Amino acid sequence: MPLYEHVFLARQDVTAQQVETMVETYKGVIETGGGTIEKIESWGVKSLAYRIKKNRKAHFTLLNISAPPAAVAEMERQMQISEDVLRFMTVRVEQLEAEPSAMMQKRDRDDRKDRDRGDRPRRRDDDFGGGDRGDRGDRGDRPERNFGGEN
Protein backbone atom coordinates (compact mmCIF):
# COMPACT_ATOMS: atom_id res chain seq x y z
CA MET A 1 0.00 0.00 0.00
CA PRO A 2 1.33 3.50 -0.75
CA LEU A 3 2.77 5.54 2.10
CA TYR A 4 2.08 9.25 2.61
CA GLU A 5 3.13 12.10 4.88
CA HIS A 6 0.27 14.55 5.30
CA VAL A 7 0.47 17.92 7.10
CA PHE A 8 -2.51 20.16 7.65
CA LEU A 9 -2.95 23.58 9.22
CA ALA A 10 -6.06 24.34 11.28
CA ARG A 11 -7.23 27.84 12.22
CA GLN A 12 -5.76 29.25 15.44
CA ASP A 13 -9.16 29.96 17.03
CA VAL A 14 -9.99 26.24 16.93
CA THR A 15 -9.23 24.56 20.27
CA ALA A 16 -6.74 21.71 20.61
CA GLN A 17 -9.65 19.41 21.46
CA GLN A 18 -11.39 20.34 18.20
CA VAL A 19 -8.17 19.64 16.28
CA GLU A 20 -8.05 16.18 17.88
CA THR A 21 -11.67 15.63 16.81
CA MET A 22 -10.75 16.63 13.25
CA VAL A 23 -7.84 14.17 13.29
CA GLU A 24 -10.18 11.39 14.47
CA THR A 25 -12.62 12.27 11.68
CA TYR A 26 -9.91 12.07 9.02
CA LYS A 27 -8.57 8.89 10.62
CA GLY A 28 -12.04 7.38 10.21
CA VAL A 29 -12.08 8.37 6.52
CA ILE A 30 -8.71 6.67 5.95
CA GLU A 31 -9.75 3.52 7.83
CA THR A 32 -13.05 3.36 5.94
CA GLY A 33 -11.05 3.49 2.71
CA GLY A 34 -8.93 0.52 3.80
CA GLY A 35 -5.88 2.32 5.16
CA THR A 36 -4.25 3.06 8.49
CA ILE A 37 -2.66 6.06 10.14
CA GLU A 38 0.74 5.00 11.43
CA LYS A 39 1.67 8.12 13.40
CA ILE A 40 0.04 11.39 14.49
CA GLU A 41 2.13 14.36 15.63
CA SER A 42 0.68 17.61 16.85
CA TRP A 43 3.24 20.39 16.42
CA GLY A 44 1.11 22.94 18.26
CA VAL A 45 0.23 26.51 17.33
CA LYS A 46 2.93 28.20 15.24
CA SER A 47 3.22 31.55 13.51
CA LEU A 48 2.75 31.54 9.76
CA ALA A 49 5.23 33.21 7.42
CA TYR A 50 2.35 35.15 5.86
CA ARG A 51 -1.38 35.49 6.40
CA ILE A 52 -3.52 32.64 5.12
CA LYS A 53 -7.25 33.31 5.00
CA LYS A 54 -6.78 36.19 7.48
CA ASN A 55 -4.91 34.00 10.00
CA ARG A 56 -1.41 34.69 11.33
CA LYS A 57 -1.12 31.46 13.37
CA ALA A 58 -2.28 27.88 12.92
CA HIS A 59 -2.34 24.44 14.55
CA PHE A 60 0.11 22.18 12.68
CA THR A 61 -0.54 18.42 12.56
CA LEU A 62 1.39 15.63 10.81
CA LEU A 63 -0.19 12.31 9.79
CA ASN A 64 1.82 9.35 8.50
CA ILE A 65 -0.60 7.35 6.37
CA SER A 66 -0.59 3.93 4.74
CA ALA A 67 -3.66 3.88 2.50
CA PRO A 68 -4.91 3.46 -1.06
CA PRO A 69 -4.90 6.66 -3.16
CA ALA A 70 -8.71 6.80 -3.20
CA ALA A 71 -8.87 7.03 0.61
CA VAL A 72 -6.29 9.84 0.67
CA ALA A 73 -8.17 11.67 -2.09
CA GLU A 74 -11.41 11.45 -0.08
CA MET A 75 -9.67 12.82 3.03
CA GLU A 76 -8.25 15.72 0.99
CA ARG A 77 -11.71 16.41 -0.48
CA GLN A 78 -13.19 16.67 3.01
CA MET A 79 -10.36 18.97 4.09
CA GLN A 80 -11.07 21.28 1.15
CA ILE A 81 -14.69 21.53 2.28
CA SER A 82 -13.82 22.23 5.93
CA GLU A 83 -13.59 25.89 6.92
CA ASP A 84 -11.29 25.04 9.83
CA VAL A 85 -8.49 23.69 7.60
CA LEU A 86 -6.36 26.49 6.16
CA ARG A 87 -3.92 24.41 4.11
CA PHE A 88 -2.81 20.84 3.68
CA MET A 89 -0.15 18.97 1.76
CA THR A 90 0.22 15.27 1.08
CA VAL A 91 3.50 13.79 -0.12
CA ARG A 92 4.00 10.19 -1.19
CA VAL A 93 7.10 8.66 0.40
CA GLU A 94 9.01 5.42 -0.05
CA GLN A 95 9.14 4.70 3.67
CA LEU A 96 7.70 6.27 6.81
CA GLU A 97 10.13 7.52 9.44
CA ALA A 98 9.84 5.81 12.81
CA GLU A 99 11.63 8.47 14.86
CA PRO A 100 10.06 11.84 15.70
CA SER A 101 9.96 14.38 12.90
CA ALA A 102 12.39 17.30 12.70
CA MET A 103 9.74 19.63 14.15
CA MET A 104 9.35 17.46 17.25
CA GLN A 105 13.12 17.15 17.68
CA LYS A 106 13.40 20.94 17.42
CA ARG A 107 10.73 21.38 20.09
CA ASP A 108 12.60 18.98 22.40
CA ARG A 109 15.81 20.94 21.83
CA ASP A 110 14.02 24.22 22.61
CA ASP A 111 12.64 22.75 25.85
CA ARG A 112 16.17 21.94 27.04
CA LYS A 113 17.47 25.46 26.47
CA ASP A 114 16.33 26.85 29.84
CA ARG A 115 17.83 24.15 32.03
CA ASP A 116 21.39 24.54 30.72
CA ARG A 117 22.19 27.53 32.94
CA GLY A 118 20.97 25.88 36.11
CA ASP A 119 21.41 28.12 39.14
CA ARG A 120 24.39 30.00 37.69
CA PRO A 121 24.03 33.79 37.66
CA ARG A 122 23.19 35.65 34.46
CA ARG A 123 26.11 36.72 32.34
CA ARG A 124 26.85 40.38 31.96
CA ASP A 125 26.21 40.40 28.20
CA ASP A 126 22.92 38.45 28.20
CA ASP A 127 19.99 40.06 26.39
CA PHE A 128 22.08 42.69 24.61
CA GLY A 129 23.16 44.16 27.93
CA GLY A 130 26.49 45.27 26.58
CA GLY A 131 29.75 43.51 26.48
CA ASP A 132 32.94 43.52 24.49
CA ARG A 133 32.76 44.55 20.85
CA GLY A 134 35.51 42.09 20.02
CA ASP A 135 38.21 43.26 17.65
CA ARG A 136 36.14 46.18 16.31
CA GLY A 137 37.77 49.47 17.06
CA ASP A 138 36.25 52.79 18.01
CA ARG A 139 34.44 54.52 15.15
CA GLY A 140 36.22 57.77 15.90
CA ASP A 141 35.23 61.24 14.71
CA ARG A 142 33.19 61.23 11.52
CA PRO A 143 32.53 64.18 9.22
CA GLU A 144 29.05 65.63 9.21
CA ARG A 145 26.90 64.30 6.36
CA ASN A 146 25.00 66.67 4.12
CA PHE A 147 21.73 65.35 2.65
CA GLY A 148 19.94 68.44 1.33
CA GLY A 149 22.07 69.11 -1.70
CA GLU A 150 23.37 72.20 0.08
CA ASN A 151 27.07 72.79 -0.20
From Swiss-Prot:
A single Gene Ontology CC annotation of this entry is:
cytosolic small ribosomal subunit
Keywords for this protein: Ribonucleoprotein, Ribosomal protein, RNA-binding, rRNA-binding
Q: Give the GO terms filed under biological process for this record.
A: translation
Q: Which Pfam families match?
A: Ribosomal_S6
**Basic and acidic residues composition bias: which ranges?**
105-151
Q: Where is this region: Disordered?
A: 97-151
- Coiled-coil positions are none
The GO terms this record gives for MF are: small ribosomal subunit rRNA binding; structural constituent of ribosome
* Purpose: Binds together with bS18 to 16S ribosomal RNA.
Which NCBIfam families does its entry note?
Answer: S6
Q: Which family does it belong to?
A: Belongs to the bacterial ribosomal protein bS6 family.
* Name recorded for this polypeptide: Small ribosomal subunit protein bS6
Species whose genome carries this gene: Methylorubrum extorquens (strain PA1) (Methylobacterium extorquens)
